[in-house]
Structures are given as C-alpha cells and as structure tokens.
UniProtKB/Swiss-Prot annotation:
This is T-box transcription factor TBX20. Residues 103-282 bind DNA. GO terms for molecular function: DNA-binding transcription factor activity, RNA polymerase II-specific; RNA polymerase II cis-regulatory region sequence-specific DNA binding. It comes from the Eukaryota. Expressed throughout all cardiac tissue during later stages of development. Also expressed in the cement gland, jugular vein, lung bud, cloacal aperture, rhombomeres 2, 4, 6 and 8 and in a subset of motor neurons. Pfam families: T-box. GO terms for cellular component: chromatin; nucleus. One of its GO terms (biological process) is positive regulation of DNA-templated transcription. Keywords: Developmental protein, DNA-binding, Nucleus, Transcription, Transcription regulation. Transcriptional regulator that may be involved in heart developmental processes. It is found in: Nucleus.
C-alpha cells in the first residue's frame, strides 16, 4: 500500500501576509537603497575616526632617541593628520624621551597588560615623557592617544605563557585624544619638567562620557604622544590639519587591554612596582628586623587581661616594662601562693586604698606619678571570704570609711580558665548565682 502525503494546509490571506516569504519580498529596491545610503556614511565615519595606525610617514623615536620613518598604513584619513615627511626645521629639533623606560622594558619583556573597566582604570606604568629642543618662548600643547597595533584579537595560552592570535579584531571603537590638563605649556616649562599622563583612564564602555580612552579587551594597543606648537589662532583641537605637530612612539609601551590579568608574572611585577599596591603585599615581604619587631609587639599584647585588674596598669609599659610583665605573670601564674592582700599590693603598688585628698603626700615628681594609682572603688572593695557575696551599698559604705581596709590572708584559687573566657564572661563565672549587682554612679 503506497503512502500518499497529506496536502499542505492552506494559510488564510491574513496569515499569509506574515509569512517569511511575504516579509522578505515586502521590501522594495528603493527602500533598500535608502537604507544603504544612511548606513554607509556612518560606517565611513567610524573607519575614519578609528584608524589603527597613522598614515604616511610619522616620526618614531627609537631607543636611542633618533628620528626614523614608519611605513605607510592602509588608512586614508586618520584622526591625527599626517606629519610631513620632512618636518619643519623648528619641529625637527624637538626630541622626546620616555622617563620610566627601565620599568617599561621589564613589563615589555613579559608582555604588558592594562586593565580596562566600565568606570575607567588608570595605567601603570604611567607614561612620563620629557622634551628637549623646544623654543623657550613658544607655547605647546601635549596630548596622547592610543591606537590599535594590528587588526587581530589575542588570547593568552597558559600552558605556553604566551599570547596567541585568536582571530580577527573587533570593530574599532571611536578614537579619542587626551589633552594634558596642564596644556598649553611654555617651552621653558617643558625644558624644566616632565609631562606625566597619570590621569589617563582606560575603559571598555562605548557610551563613556567622561573622556576616557575606549579600548577593546584582548587587543594590542600603542600609545602615542603628540606635541603641537600653539599659534595665536589655535582655539580648539578639533581640526589639526592646519597645525604644526610632531608624533612620538615608544615601542616598549605596547600593551594588551584585558579585564583581568592573564600573566601571573605581570601581576607580581605590578604589585612590586606600584607604590599604590601596598595592600596586596603580605607579611612575608617584611625584613627580618621588621618581622622581629612585629612579633615582639604581638607577644606584648597577647597576655590575658584580668577582669579585676586595677586602673593605671597601661602606664606601666612606658615606665618599667620588666616590672609590669612580672606583675602580670604573678597575677596569672603564682596566684595560688599569694593572699588577696599581697596580690593586690603587688599589682597596685599600694598596701591599701588612698583617698584622693591624700595624693598630695606622694609629691609631684615624675617618679611618684609613674606609680600606678588604683581605682577608688576598685581598691576599696572589702575582701570577703567568698568573692560571690553580695556587694550591698551598706557594705561599700562601711568599706569606704577609714584610711583603708585591712585584707585578711586567705588562699586564692586559680582563675586561669575564667580569664581565658574574656573579662565579661570571667566576671559572670566568678559571681555567685545569688549575687545582686549594685550599679555605681
């Protein structure tokens, strides 16, 4: 029995109007021509405003600072107009040198990477240049831009620790010029100081409105420094075709834009070289002397604080460090062999409580002031046979009368496990369940 396919369902006129064939054939040639006429100018504008390399022969500074010529590029109209093959005599005398060349060479040997973020990230190393051969009486404008090195996209191969070509580059983004905020400079200023582009920020936000330089991630870029001789009619930098300028390129400043560092050696070198990356340095980078001082400082502050320790003990660290450490040790290690009266006397330095009026008898010398003074209420507490007995106002009032209480001798138990719990928990453990606390005002 032969199979006969069922006939295709027929669409209604309304449904047929929204079919794929009807939608594809609905556009007229006139509409397509009008659409192309509006898109082509935009594409041409993007291509012209984001040229990968300057056209023609521009001045390139090699490692020795000599003037050379670069081969012509395929771009027809770059953002920065072409410098003449032979610059004017005045501009030809100007030379530019990279101040941080040694640091750039270290990064260049590993493959420099620059972080780009949505909000913008500053460059490190920073491009710092100095000029010579300028006219001291003239005014100059210094600016910088960053252009793609090639039309390729890269990826980092971790097993080879190298950058490999991953494909064709993404569509170029609009190029931007960064004019140094201190421009225009006088020639005298350029001869005495260097120009630092430390405020340049790199971003991957195509809608950025803060003047940051927009880059694509995983693409290689080349920074360029331009110097323009300012004339009287130079009002803006929108059109540089009529200006006299010079471009300088340093090959060691080529970098790859990334959203996260790929090479761990680059990360380590940036942490070691960047003074603003101190937060990423761990304690293992300390020297032996610094490590010993830190360890001794930690040991001095690692003792357990007694919840019933008298006031004024912190001042002992400045006066007699050895005596204070000994007092603290006696409070925690030999308390079982001391009575409460002798223990309080050894820790406070007083046999009994001294009223504030009687402090004049101590004198005003520095030695007497360095002696720890117990807290009035804390030093006057009566030594009951049990620390858990209620401290009523009447008992406190009776203890405050007279020149000072007399402490009966009795054996003091160990409180090591209470002190390890912290001051508040230790007091709660020492206090009897029926204790009534009276607030001191």
């Amino acid at each position: 029995m032969e199979y006969t396919p069922s006939p295709k369902p027929q669409l209604s006129s309304r449904a047929n109007a929204f079919s794929i064939a009807a939608l594809m054939s609905s556009g007229t040639p006139k509409d397509k021509e009008a659409q192309e006429s509006t898109i082509k100018p935009l594409e041409q504008f993007v291509e012209k405003s984001s040229c990968s390399q300057p056209i023609g022969d521009i001045s390139i500074v090699d490692s020795h600072g000599e003037f050379t010529n670069s081969p012509s590029s395929l771009c027809t109209e770059p953002l920065i107009p072409t410098t003449p093959i032979i610059p004017s005599e005045e501009m030809a005398k100007i030379s530019c040198s990279l101040e941080t060349k040694e640091l750039w060479d270290k990064f260049h040997d590993l493959g420099t990477e620059m972080i780009i973020t949505k909000s913008g990230r500053r460059m490190f190393p920073t491009i710092r240049v100095s000029f010579s051969g300028v006219d001291a009486d003239a005014k100059y404008i210094v600016l910088m831009d960053i252009v793609p090195v090639d039309n390729k996209r890269y990826r980092y191969a971790y097993h080879r620790s190298a950058w490999l070509v991953a494909g064709k580059a993404d569509p170029p983004l609009p190029a931007r010029l960064y004019v140094h905020p201190d421009s225009p400079f006088t020639g005298e200023q350029l001869l005495k100081q260097m120009v630092s582009f430390e405020k340049v920020k790199l971003t991957n936000n195509e809608l950025d409105q803060h003047g940051h330089i927009i880059l694509n991630s995983m693409h290689k870029y080349q920074p360029r420094v331009h110097i323009i001789k300012k004339k009287d009619h130079t009002a803006s930098l929108l059109n540089l075709k009529s200006e006299e300028f010079r471009t300088f390129i340093f090959q060691e400043t080529v970098f790859t834009a990334v959203t996260a560092y790929q090479n761990q050696l680059i990360t380590k070198l940036k942490i070691d070289s960047n003074p603003f990356a101190k937060g990423f340095r761990d304690s293992s980078r300390l020297t032996d002397i610094e490590r010993e001082s830190v360890e001794s400082l930690i040991q001095k502050h690692s003792y357990a604080r007694s919840p019933i320790r008298t006031y004024g003990g912190d001042e002992d660290v400045l006066s007699e460090d050895g005596q204070v450490v000994q007092c603290r040790g006696s409070a925690f290690t030999t308390s079982d062999n001391l009575s409460l009266s002798s223990w309080v006397s050894s820790t406070s330095g007083f046999s009994g409580f001294q009223h504030p009026q009687s402090l004049t008898a101590l004198g005003t010398s520095t030695a007497s002031l360095a002696t720890p003074i117990p807290h009035p209420i804390q030093g006057s507490l009566p030594p009951y046979s049990r620390l858990g007995m209620p401290l009523t106002p009447s008992a406190l009032a009776s203890s405050m009368q007279g020149s000072g209480p007399t402490f009966p001798s009795f054996h003091m138990p160990r409180y090591h496990h209470y002190f390890q719990q912290g001051p508040y928990a230790a007091i709660q453990g020492l206090r009897h369940s029926s204790t009534v606390m009276t607030p001191f005002v």
